[in-house]
Amino acid sequence: MAWIDETPEHAAEGVLKEAYARIGRALGRVIPFYRAYSVSPQHLHAHLDFYEKIGKLGVLSKRRKELIAVAVSAENGCRDCTALHAGFLRAHRVDEAVVAALAADPGRALADGHVTGAEAVILGYALKLTRTPHAMRAEDVQALRDAGLTEPEVFEVALLTAYFNYTNRVGEGLGVEPE
């Protein structure tokens, strides 16, 4: 339960009921984060539109998108988002030790070598952008290129990092708790 009023699924009507149906089709259930949006169904639909697009469009693999989601969400202490996206990583057959390490402490997971190669560079960039956005430099983008990422992939890493920081802050700011 969030700190603001929420409409439960059984009481949803109209636009909100449609949004909940979309979420149910995609996730199998309406998670607490989306129930917090119930006070503004129009914003919920807009958010779902954007989320669906960034999930389907682009060139990054689903695995890399979910690695970013877990690392950023865990770094921000957003338990609801961390749990949801850790589940998606497991569904993509990412080793449980990697998922658990990232969900517990993404910085330590990188330092301990749970994630390596280009994915470590991606998550290092994502964590720096999450922690200290004002400290980002051209060298941070160059490190992504040096790891083999294309310009569209570099853009997508920045976009996804910013997106998950946004969602984490909405959830944390409204007191969303995992089920």
Where are these regions (language model features)?
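Hydrophobic alpha-helical segments
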Residues: M1-E179
